[in-house]
Amino acid sequence: MRHGLLALICWLCCVVAHSEMLNVEQSGLFRAWFVRIAQEQLRQGPSPRWYQQDCAGLVRFAANEALKIHDSKWLKSNGIASQYLPPEMTLTPEQRQLAQNWNQGNGKTGPYVTAINLIQYNSQFIGQDINQALPGDMIFFDQG
């Protein structure tokens, strides 16, 4: 019997309980950088620093790169033109490390998280209406 697809729209929560969360403005800028970096990976081909080239790897890579300082050296090394860029984020050193502290389950955190743990422990459910999705939201499909 064929099961219908259920789209779960989620927003990435790359924070752990002991880390400093991003405020609303920082979250919006993070989202903009996250989308731009992910788009560039699809447009240009994968960066040599995107080691695990699967969907979860793209999320981890884009989140990590979005939290970095996007100076001319970073732009050049990523092959990203300096036009049409989101504004730079002002972050603390702790905030810049958020994507190195994925919730891996069982009270553990680290720089790597599997796809299932990305969904279960590092995403926030928003809804099932695809019309609610914003750039940077992740859509998961449950094929039952």
Labelled PLM ranges:
Residues 1-4:
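Positively charged n-region of N-terminal signal peptides that target proteins for export
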Residues 48-66:
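Active-site nucleophilic cysteine motif
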Residues 71-81:
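Short acidic alpha-helical/loop segments enriched in Asp/Glu that coordinate divalent cations
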Residues 41-50, 123-127:
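Second-shell loop/turn segments in exported
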Residues 18-43:
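Non-catalytic ligand/cofactor/substrate-binding and regulatory segments of enzyme domains
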Residues 83-144:
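...with weaker cross-activation on analogous glycine-rich loops/strands in unrelated enzymes
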Residues 12-17:
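N-terminal signal peptide c-region/cleavage motif recognized by signal peptidases
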